[in-house]
């Protein structure tokens, strides 16, 4: 009985996991950043705050790597007044830096228009908090043009809806029982990898299902996709996509023996064949109905 009473609901466990994860990331940011994340807590999901924390950490690493004033700084030495010491040109340089940079592990990271827009939105929100409260006297992010989005979104969801969708796939089976729970758990890591990849890179569903195991390059965090017309190109991904792919590869994919002719396929169906476009579309719609029942979701084929 005690075990049953201590069992957390899906939402409770998600909140706990994400809160602990955010606390760990905040340890890698300047101490004053905690005030911002505490302030936005009521209006954002934990997953959104985690994404913003990663994005803002990139900004401070950029300053330490590229701005002579902060060349010898450690992350703990930054104070809030350093924000108002920057000029619009510094923010523009950061925006340019985001297109291609190396992370802590020396992996080359690139950002699509969507990724660039999200990171700049995070920085503007961060600055806006301190400026609105008159903690800093100027906000250079307001004087910089934000990136325009031209690419078509694969799934038309806002940031919080995306967070809810991924959280549901991660923990939605917690309250299920029997065969429903068994099926949910069997496909969870695969589905989470697919959704995170689609949302994190903007590739088409047809490009996603066409991926082979050898198309993934974890050394540079890139995937080789075949575009319409047969042209191939490398699309780079971030830490969240990397983690989701590795979890899937080291669990579900490793434990599945593919049928003959499907040995190289990255994403396998429960029938041990390469997943098709229709199967992924149905999977996306299934989860989206649970999270946004009043919103029609159509993945980008």
Where are the regions a protein language model picked out?
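Conserved catalytic core of the tyrosine transesterase superfamily
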Residues: 1-301
């Amino acid at each position: 009985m005690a075990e049953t009473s201590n069992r957390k609901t899906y939402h409770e466990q998600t909140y706990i996991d994400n809160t602990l994860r955010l606390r760990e990331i905040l340890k890698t940011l300047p101490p004053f950043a905690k005030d911002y994340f505490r302030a936005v807590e009521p209006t954002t999901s934990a997953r959104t705050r985690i994404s913003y924390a990663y994005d803002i950490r990139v900004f401070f690493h950029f300053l330490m790597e590229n701005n002579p004033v902060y060349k010898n700084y450690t992350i703990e030495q930054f104070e809030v007044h350093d924000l108002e010491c920057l000029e619009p040109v510094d923010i523009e340089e950061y925006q340019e830096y985001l297109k291609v940079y190396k992370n802590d592990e020396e992996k080359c990271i690139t950002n699509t228009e969507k990724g660039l827009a999200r990171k700049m939105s995070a920085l503007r929100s961060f600055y806006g908090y301190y400026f609105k409260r008159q903690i800093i006297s100027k906000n250079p992010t307001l004087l910089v043009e934000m990136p325009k989005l031209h690419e078509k979104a694969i799934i038309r969801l806002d940031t919080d809806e995306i967070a809810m969708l991924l959280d549901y796939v991660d923990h939605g089976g917690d309250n299920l029982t029997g065969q429903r729970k068994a099926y949910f758990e069997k496909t969870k890591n695969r589905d989470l990898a697919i959704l995170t990849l689609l949302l994190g890179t903007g590739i088409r569903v047809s490009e996603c299902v066409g991926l082979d195991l050898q198309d993934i390059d974890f050394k540079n965090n890139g995937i080789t996709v075949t575009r319409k017309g047969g042209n191939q190109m490398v699309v780079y991904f971030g830490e969240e996509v990397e983690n989701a792919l590795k979890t899937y590869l080291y669990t579900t994919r490793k434990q599945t023996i593919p049928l003959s002719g499907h040995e190289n396929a990255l994403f396998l169906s429960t029938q041990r064949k390469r997943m098709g476009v229709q199967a992924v579309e149905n999977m996306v719609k299934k989860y989206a109905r649970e999270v946004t029942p009043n919103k029609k979701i159509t993945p980008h084929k």
